[in-house]
Amino acid sequence: METVAVLGTGLVGNWIVRSLSSDGYKVIAIDADKSILSRLNDVADTIHGIVDEDLINSLDTDIFVNALPGRVGHRIRKILVEKGKKIADLAFTPEDPLEINQLAIDNDSILIYDVGVAPGLSNLLLKEANRRHGRLSIGRIRVGGNPTTKDDGWSYMAPFSPVDVIEEYTRPARIIRNGEVVTLPALSERIRFEISERGEMEAFLTDGLRSVLQTIDAEELIESTVRWPGHIDMYLKKKEELSEEDLVKAWSWDTNRPEFTWMEVYARGEGNSTWILDDNGDEKGSSMARTTGAITCAVVKFLIKEKGIYGVHPPENFGNDLLEMCLNEYSKNNIKINEIKN
């Protein structure tokens, strides 16, 4: 079996390491935090250190998962591409990964980016909707990971880097409206709606469409993040008085608190399709860790299987072949995604 190096072993990276190891792959786990890395000693070779060019050069593998925070993720993906690696890239960065497409081609490297739930699985479902229904009059993604119950405070805990969440709340949102890409303020177009068996939630625009702005044929295309009502009101009220460090502490993960990940992808063209993901997690990991990590693991297996493909690609470039592998990975991990027949 192939050896896979996983860069970053937070909640999602940890799940990826354990899943790939259980599937028989040799895994090398790398992180700067010794305390979280030590939890993986039983399933992987572990390396404690800062990910840099020297560390990458020391690793005897061509398959990498970039699960680093967005602020460092782009710098590392460039190093990996220059060295001709195959990369499943989970780092959500302000930089466009396609900037290094030619670099990847020149170095016989392949990088598939945005390999999570949204962006990631959402891209593949929209591509499938295009295949079924032609040009979409509307494509809509609503997605979020939240505690199962509301509280008197933030009603939130960050399932990935809290710093990335803050950037999500501040980066202007690019959407498609009337067939054109337009930019709107983050957190705008707030709407309350009901989730079956969950209750009333609130959705607001965030900049998660990324590659599908170019790859999906649609008259209108939007992505919204979902939170409990009151969360964004509190953020808007307190964002000037709280530092980044304050928010990181306030949104820290509580492993004992029940949580869920929910996503709806709705598409209408010549016909319509709706997919709903609703997951509570299990004893092996949080809902966001496993719903995200399973997509990343499917991409790793796709990269190992495919030969002679180079460049930087969003997942939807590989259409139904990759979608089937992702859905199979979900099924294997008992993650339910339901298509609603309309």
Residue ranges and their predicted role:
Residues V27-L40:
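NAD(P)-binding Rossmann-fold cofactor-contacting core
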Residues R132-N342:
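C-terminal catalytic/substrate-binding lobe primarily of soluble NAD(P)-dependent oxidoreductases
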Residues V12:
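Hydrophobic/small residue at the entry helix of a nucleotide-binding pocket
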Residues I63-A67, I87-D89:
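N-terminal Rossmann-like NAD(P) cofactor-binding module of classical short-chain dehydrogenase/reductase
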Residues A91-L111:
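Rossmann-fold NAD(P)-binding glycine/threonine-rich loop
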Residues V4-G8:
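Conserved N-terminal Rossmann-fold NAD(P)-binding element of oxidoreductases
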Residues I79-P97:
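ADP-ribose/adenylate-binding Rossmann-like module
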Residues L20:
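Aromatic pocket-lining residues of Rossmann-like dinucleotide-binding sites
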